[in-house]
Regions:
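Nucleotidyltransferase catalytic core that binds NTPs
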Residues: 1-148
Length: 148
């Protein structure tokens, strides 16, 4: 959310695009993720949400976007994002990939960490936006691993 807020200050229009990856099964459907993103971004009038399948470069071409913005928390993020940015550059030279370092307060926050906390019955509400925190917490209940 921090990267989205900062992007909204930097750009006239921001599209938060959710990849529909049929190879992955997430806690929430793409439609549910879009719904939650819309609520989280409701106070940012220049932010809209969308979803896509396939290559990011194809989506960027189709929507005529000029920039792909990626948030980075660590060197490990850079190590995985940089090769993808290079491939996207080869597929679509007219689009730029920009990297925005995460706010230090969010360096340890990731969807994997939130999933781990939720699966073990921990309180995820401090780590997700308040307007969706209860919904996210409830979604973990059927998957929780009992703690001793």
């Amino acid at each position: 959310l921090d990267v989205i807020r900062r992007a909204a200050r930097l750009f006239d229009q921001v599209v938060v695009a959710v990849l529909h990856n049929p190879a992955k099964t997430g806690l929430f459907s793409v439609e549910k993720r879009l719904d939650m993103l819309r609520r989280v971004c409701a106070q940012m009038p220049n932010v809209r949400t969308d979803s896509f399948e396939g290559l990011l470069a194809d989506y960027v071409r189709k929507t005529d976007a000029a920039v792909v913005l990626r948030g980075l928390r660590s060197e490990a993020d850079f190590q995985s994002e940089f090769p993808m940015a290079q491939l996207n550059r080869q597929l679509l030279p007219q689009a730029e990939t920009l990297f925005l370092p995460a706010d230090p307060a969010h360096l340890c926050l990731s969807s994997s960490a939130v999933r781990e906390i939720g699966r073990f019955g921990g309180d995820v509400t401090p780590f997700v936006p308040s307007c969706i925190s209860q919904e996210v917490a409830e979604a973990f209940q059927p998957y929780q691993i009992r703690r001793n």
